Amino acid sequence: SDIRAFSNAEYSDKGLEVSSDVSEAKVMIGVKEVPIDSLIADKSYFFFSHTIKKQPYNRKLLQAILKKRITLYDHETLVDSNYNRLIGFGYYAGIVGAYNGIRTIGKKYNCFKLPKAIKLRDRLEFDSALKNIMLPNLKIILTGTGRVGQGAKEVLDIMQIKKVEVKDFLTKEFEEPVYVQLDVLDLSLIHI
């Protein structure tokens, strides 16, 4: 992929062999779906194919995998003996999604600038960027308490944004940015 966090040089610097010739490789490992025209026949692939739930937009991908006699190991289907998923990026998707949302607020109101998350080298730099900004006086609704929701909550907590109860969120005015975290039951009981 051309969208990467680490360059070939960084892999080489760590002693890994980097080659554009993958003809001898038996297994290809990635994260996102591989473009259909990039699939190599008779290989084994590990990636999130987004086909396990019969997603119609990836039907052609699955058909190409079958046609090219590819063995697919979908990250989403890798589970332990209790059927708990072993690989899931939901938590990190929540972190990056919330970061991008905060970044968008800064751009919209022209009140601060955050670099793109991919430009930050590590978690320390990521957290530091968030701690150094001030949001305008906003009310933020965070929906969900699962992995994605917990990741997003972590970003708001790093920024020391005050968490408030649903009733207060709906009825009070605040002199600072605040957020409320709603779960499914909250959403079924209120009309926002």
Language-model regions, residue ranges each:
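Glycine/serine-rich phosphate-binding loop and adjoining beta1-alpha1 elements at the start
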Residues: 36-138
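Glycine-rich Rossmann-fold phosphate-binding loop(s) that bind the pyrophosphate
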Residues: 145
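An N-terminal-biased, well-structured beta-alpha scaffold segment characteristic
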Residues: 1-64
